[in-house]
Amino acid sequence: MEITVKTLDGIEAGSVTLSDEIFGLEPRADILHRCVTWQLSRRQAGTHRTKGRSEINRTSKKMYKQKGTGNARHGAASAPQFRGGGRAFGPVVRSHAIDLPKKVRALALKHALSSKAKAAQIIVLDKVSLDDPKTKALKEHFAKLGLESVLIVDGAQVEQNVALAARNLPYVDVLPIQGINVYDILRRDTLVLTKAAVDALEARFK
């Protein structure tokens, strides 16, 4: 797949060939869904917790004798049916993480990249750099390229001025190539790759 390389000012600066093994697959929604679910499950804190009847600060003495009062049979006031009693089957501290094989994760990344390529939502830039860490300057460059919701993936190191300038834009994410992931690719409208990022992806899936 041949794609035009542009500068940050929107000027053409050659072309690059994207591998069909990475960018030319037919996207499968089921694989993408599995990977996004796996990512989001690992983000959940799992620190929710309530106290059971054995943990609350209340006496464990029987409320009244078993027989002879005419009332229903009850044990301690810490039982779940009483106000202030312990929670029955409440949430406990646990991990929400699920497992996903490495090969499926790698395949999902290829399908995410392919889905953007198929929708013509990939832009390749020769490099992404700014003279000053100014959000206004970055927005002007995005206006020339017609970008709003965008994920920028650079090489091994993200240019510091770009990272600082993009930090104040709510729909712009900047990642080094080792941080590229399915969820962040899909949640933004446009994927911007530098030539260094394309080379790194080609080497990664060689």
From Swiss-Prot:
Gene3D superfamilies: 3.40.1370.10. One of its GO terms (biological process) is translation. GO terms for cellular component: ribonucleoprotein complex; ribosome. SUPFAM superfamilies: Ribosomal protein L4. GO terms for molecular function: rRNA binding; structural constituent of ribosome. The keyword RNA-binding applies. Keywords: Ribonucleoprotein, Ribosomal protein, RNA-binding, rRNA-binding. InterPro entries: Ribosomal_uL4, Ribosomal_uL4-like, Ribosomal_uL4_dom_sf. Part of the 50S ribosomal subunit. One of the primary rRNA binding proteins, this protein initially binds near the 5'-end of the 23S rRNA. It is important during the early stages of 50S assembly. It makes multiple contacts with different domains of the 23S rRNA in the assembled 50S subunit and ribosome. Forms part of the polypeptide exit tunnel. HAMAP family: Ribosomal_uL4_B. Belongs to the universal ribosomal protein uL4 family. NCBIfam families: rplD_bact. This is Large ribosomal subunit protein uL4. It comes from Xanthobacter autotrophicus (strain ATCC BAA-1158 / Py2). The gene is rplD.
